[in-house]
Design a protein with these regions (language model features):
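Flexible hinge/capping segments at coil-to-helix
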Residues: 120-137
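Short helix-initiation/N-cap motifs at beta->coil->alpha
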Residues: 69-80, 124-125, 160-175, 206-208
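Periplasmic-binding protein-like
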Residues: 35, 111-119, 189-229, 248-270, ...
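A ligand-binding cleft/hinge motif common to bilobed small-molecule-binding domains
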Residues: 77-80, 92-102, 150-151, 172-206
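Extracytoplasmic small-molecule ligand-binding "clamshell" domains
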Residues: 26-94
């Protein structure tokens, strides 16, 4: 059995699994997410929302023995709503940044948030940005991927074409108007899972992760939820959820299968280096 190591080291799946119990002091947690960010959360035909982060929220509630009161709202109102006390914490996929860590607490990362290229199925794999030189890259207009691709247009030598939705940008690849589409890795993976005409290509690592945000006054709650997240990594739940919603199996080193020492994400404000062993049911 391996134990959590000091700051800067990690525990990988299979190296640690201890039995224990998690006790909650509340019957219900009010949480929120953006209900239009597929495949993390999206409307159901019968009402309500479904997706990776909906499953994540419900599994956290199940393991804590509490009800998760999930609100689907516009992204722009989520962080202010949490800070105002409307929500106990957010279950929306939230990119952890240095700026955000100054005003909020975060769990350790549970998913990588990278830039993923999609190409027509049968296209040879591209192993780096240089492989897209002279190609047309389609993007969702106004997105972070649009801005990023345009910032590299001269350096890489690609042409960027913007579309009103990422679905339209993917269709441009299928029709041959574009060589590749670039979007978030989870969004791209979901698109490939649903469409046999396209395939995943180069994945550009940003070094960033999705983590769960809490108010600065909630370190105990953050740590309690992080304990559950770590257990879900250790017992393969995150792997199963990734395969279900993204069609992708996490590889060693991915945030979905990596338990970090301490509480929070190493290197960011709010991180606690306190050694602990996840207590898993």
């Amino acid at each position: 059995m391996a134990f959590l190591k000091p700051l800067g080291t990690i525990i990988t799946i299979g190296s640690l699994f201890l039995m224990g119990s998690v006790v909650s002091a509340k019957d219900t947690y009010k949480v929120a997410l953006d209900g239009t960010f597929a495949p993390h959360a999206m409307p159901k035909m019968a009402g309500g929302v479904e997706g990776f982060n909906v499953d994540l929220a419900n599994e956290i509630g199940r393991r804590l023995g509490v009800k998760m009161d999930i609100t689907a709202a516009q992204w722009s109102g989520l962080l202010p709503g949490m800070q105002a006390g409307t929500y106990d914490f957010l279950v929306a996929p939230t990119t952890l940044t240095e700026s955000r860590s100054k005003s909020m607490l975060f769990t350790e990362g549970y998913l990588n948030t990278d830039f993923q290229f999609v190409v027509k199925k049968g296209t040879p794999m591209v192993n780096g940005l240089a492989g897209f030189k002279g190609k047309v890259i389609s993007v969702n207009k106004g997105s972070a991927y649009d801005k990023w691709a345009r910032s590299l247009a001269d350096k890489v030598g690609w042409k960027v074409e913007s579309y009103g939705t990422n679905t339209d940008a993917v269709q441009a690849v299928i029709s041959g108007r574009a060589f590749a589409n670039v979007a978030g890795n989870t969004v791209s993976a979901r698109a490939v899972k649903k469409n046999p005409k396209i395939a995943l290509s180069f994945r550009h690592s940003t070094g960033k992760v999705f983590a769960m945000p809490f108010r600065k006054d909630s370190p105990a709650l953050r740590n309690k939820v992080e304990n559950v997240i770590e257990c879900m990594k250790l017992d393969g739940t995150f792997t199963k959820m990734s395969e279900k919603w993204f069609g992708v199996t996490p590889t060693p080193g991915d945030a979905a299968v990596t338990v970090y020492a301490g509480y929070g994400q190493p290197g960011f404000q709010g991180y606690e280096a306190t050694p602990h062993v996840p207590k898993c049911n």
